[in-house]
């Protein structure tokens, strides 16, 4: 007998193996609290910290943005912790970091290390998925991805 699979839907996108797909947790923060700054003009947040004598100060923490909605950003959970307070730029308003969400994606390795990229799945079967290409925070044609997401950790150097 021969197994035959008929695909009746026509989806255009990037074909990736299901073994490369991973779900990752992020902090969700309001857009008003994210700013550009630091030495490299990258995105980040102003985190409230305390000096040894108990004085409150604010430090710029650079963070990657992995997705956005109309009012919020999904930011990396490596630099912030639950319970941290972030301060709105040019204001004294504070926001407690606690809201979390997850995104489906793959580990992108164009720069030599595993970097999470969100994907939008258009079609999926047991072996592979068709994902939307050229999205703002996602994959493009000719991007290198990790084939088995269970074998790497975020920001791990990848040796060919």
Predicted feature residues:
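Edge-of-domain interaction segments
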Residues: 1-116, 120-160
């Amino acid at each position: 007998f021969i197994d035959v699979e008929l695909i009746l839907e026509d989806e255009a996108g990037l074909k990736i193996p299901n073994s490369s797909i991973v779900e990752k947790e992020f902090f969700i923060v309001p857009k008003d609290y994210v700013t550009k700054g630091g030495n490299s003009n990258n995105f980040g947040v102003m985190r409230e910290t305390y000096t040894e004598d108990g004085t409150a100060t604010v430090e710029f923490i650079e963070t990657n943005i992995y997705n956005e909605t109309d009012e919020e950003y999904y930011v990396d959970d490596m630099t912030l912790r639950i319970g941290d307070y972030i301060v709105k730029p040019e204001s004294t308003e504070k926001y407690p970091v606690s809201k979390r969400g997850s995104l489906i994606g793959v580990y992108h390795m164009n720069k030599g290390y595993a970097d999470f990229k969100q994907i939008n799945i258009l079609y999926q079967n047991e072996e592979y998925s068709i994902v939307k290409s050229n999205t703002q925070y996602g994959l493009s044609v000719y991007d290198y991805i990790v084939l088995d997401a269970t074998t790497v950790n975020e920001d791990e150097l990848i040796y060919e």
